[in-house]
A protein has these predicted regions:
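Eukaryote-skewed repeat-based solenoidal scaffolds used as protein-protein interaction platforms
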Residues: 1-125
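C-terminal accessory extensions appended to soluble enzyme cores
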Residues: 109-150
């Protein structure tokens, strides 16, 4: 599902709205037969009451360490990320966790790392699985990604 990020400084109503948009898009696409891997985001501990809602227990989920690791490497961001991550593990008990960017060593679970830069729009013509620089239809690339996580 799309990454509608939640930031610590966001107003609570905007955090709730971003969770709603994430789940709505995922539900809509699923109703059209598209396999959905929900992206999980959280803010501070007050968001834990709603940010994990609507995600099936034991499912495959996606998270990103990018904002917690690439911006001034602030320790507070890593602590915030790990608090939400551990709460996500407790509540959702995901089968697999697709992690965009480098996982932190403390992260537990069945983690499938994905290179953040190579998965960005800049590499839409770059096959992240084989390393080939040829254009492939998005559907074909997505099918290969699903095979990798199975």
């Amino acid at each position: 599902s799309p990454d509608f990020s939640m930031y610590l400084e966001m107003a609570p109503v905007m955090q709730l709205y971003n969770v709603f948009r994430n789940r709505w898009c995922g539900a809509y696409w699923a109703s059209k037969g598209i396999r959905i891997i929900p992206t999980v985001n959280w803010g501070n501990e007050f968001t834990f009451d709603f940010c994990f809602e609507g995600i099936e227990k034991g499912s495959v989920v996606a998270v990103s360490t990018y904002m917690a690791s690439e911006h001034d490497n602030r320790e507070a961001q890593k602590e915030w990320f790990m608090a939400g991550y551990n709460e996500m593990l407790r509540r959702i008990e995901p089968e697999k966790i697709i992690c965009y960017n480098t996982p932190f060593p403390e992260m537990q679970g069945n983690i499938v790392p994905v290179d953040y830069e190579r998965s960005s729009w800049r590499y839409m013509s770059y096959d992240v699985v084989s390393g080939e620089k040829i254009w492939k239809p998005l559907k074909q690339v997505a099918q290969r990604a699903v095979i990798m996580i199975q």
